[in-house]
Amino acid sequence: MLYHHVAENKTDHRYYVSPLLFAEQMQWLTDHGYQAITEATLAEVIRHGGKLPARPVIITFDDGNGDFFTTAYPVMSKQHLVGVAFLITNRIDKPKFLSGDQVTELINAGWEIGSHTITHPDMVRHRVDLDREIVGSKEWLDQKFGINVVSFAYPYGLSNALIIQFVTDHGYTSAARLGAQTHQSEKNLYDLSRTEIWGSFDMQQFAALMPWQ
C-alpha cells in the first residue's frame, strides 16, 4: 500500500487521504487480521526463508511529508502497525517535511526507512546522475541515522532495466514501484508492486483492493 499525505484537502483527492478515512482503513486492516511488516522483512523472508504473518501488509509513505507523522503515525501506533517511510533526502528538515528527530522516532518505533532518492527526479525520462541519487541517498541516510537502508522506491513509480540493475548492484535488497499486483517473489524483488490509496476511495473500494476479505 502507498500513501503520500494523510491530511484534509478539498481539491486533491488522489494524494491526500483524510485522517478520518485513514483511521477507518487501519481499523479495517486490524479487524480483518492483517499484520504490518516492512519491505526489508519481506525481502529477507523471500531470499532466505522464514515465516510471514498469515495476512501480511506493507504500509508505505512516499516523500517524507510531515503531515503523516502527526496524523497517520499515531493511528498506526495505536493499532500496533509499523510502516515504511521512503524519504527524499534533500527535503528532510524542510518546512512541511519530516524533521531528523521525527525520522529517528519512527526508527525507534520499528519503522523502516527507505530511499526515494535525493531530489526525486524522473530517472526514466531525463538524464540523471544515478550514482548520486541512488547511492548517495542511501549513504546519507545510513550515516545520518546510523541505519542500513536496503529498500528503494522509484520516483513516480517509474523504472527501466538500467535503473533496476543499478539499484540491484548498489546495496539494496528490494525496490518498489506502483501497481496492483499482490503476489511478490524473488523474481520481482526490485520491481515490487504497491497499490496507491487515493483519497477518493470509499471503504468498499479500499476493501476490494485487499487480497483477504
What is each model feature region?
Residues M1-T60, N65-D67, H120, V124-Q213:
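C-terminal active-site subregion of NodB/CE4 polysaccharide deacetylases
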Residues N9, I92-V103, G110, M123-E133:
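Generic structural signal for short, solvent-exposed loop/turn connectors between secondary structure elements
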Residues M1-L2, Q35-E39, I58, S77-D93, ...:
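Short, well-structured secondary-structure segments
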Residues Y73-H80, L98-S115, T168-D169, E186:
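Acidic (Asp/Glu)-rich catalytic clusters
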